[in-house]
Amino acid sequence: MKNERQIFIKEIIKNFSKSKKKIPSKFHYDLKGSKYFEKITTAKEYYITRIEKKILKKIAKKINTTFKDFTSFVEFGSGSTDKISILLNKKVKYYIPLDISFDFIRESSKKLHRNFPNLKIIPTYCDYNKFISLPNKITKIKIGFFLGSSIGNFYNGEEKIFLKNAKKTLGKNSYLFVGADLIKNKNILEKAYNDSGGFAARFNLNLVRRMNNEINTKLKINDFKYISKLNMPKSTMQSFIVSKKKQKFFINGKKFVLKKNEKIQTETSKKFTFSSFKKLAKSSGWKVNRFWCDEKNYYAVFLLSS
């Protein structure tokens, strides 16, 4: 989509004009990037998706009795619909997937509709970090979902802004399920973000391909390498693509230079404790109703209420 491309160009210019360069993680998820991420979720080292799905199966048994009236499901950064499929039931009248990659949510929505033909699906292209005006026709009770530990992918405290805007989007008497990865052994974390199949590397290096396709930067993927490591003081996995040599490129006539070994941050994945997540939710105007986790306390899904 034209607007999607313009937003991408604007963000690249803004962030590459800084001494510490970064690409916001939401731009990973064009059609090709979203499919690369699906590959990551199948990697043996990447535990997040497997554990979260097990937890969602537990939640699915409770959701029917917890919410007795007809509901609308609103998923922020929906991407693939395999997780929401676990939770859908006859009381869900509307499903509104919100994502910055319209091509991918449109494709996913068609697949979901084949399995749930009576469900009214309204795929919505948007920057879900901001307030979104939902259709008036959907049900009063709105249940939001922000899964996959995406809450950890924000820079500079933006997760609080997201949660506040999600509350405005969903409105009064709403609920939000949030998946959060928990602090654990360094070795487990670093293996998850450096899988042996190389899926995480391809996922991150795909940003170079996207820059070439959408901005005509004429960069070569082989001139970059991928690294990801744990920043212990910040309890955060940080991923970068690193320029192997000095490179230059132009955007709208403006020259940009990458030094040899210069790092471009492409992902931040904050890890939480139960108390740090509850503190975040409270400071954003949400109340933690309850949470579910696996037996090893690797991962948790929190139910928030407005």
Q: What is the predicted role of each segment?
A:
Residues 1-26:
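N-terminal auxiliary segments of SAM/dcSAM-dependent transferases
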Residues 69-79:
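Conserved class I S-adenosyl-L-methionine
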Residues 80-92:
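Conserved SAM-binding loop of SAM-dependent methyltransferases across substrates and taxa
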Residues 160-172:
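A short glycine-rich, Lys/Arg-flanked "PGG" loop and its adjoining helix->strand segment in the class I
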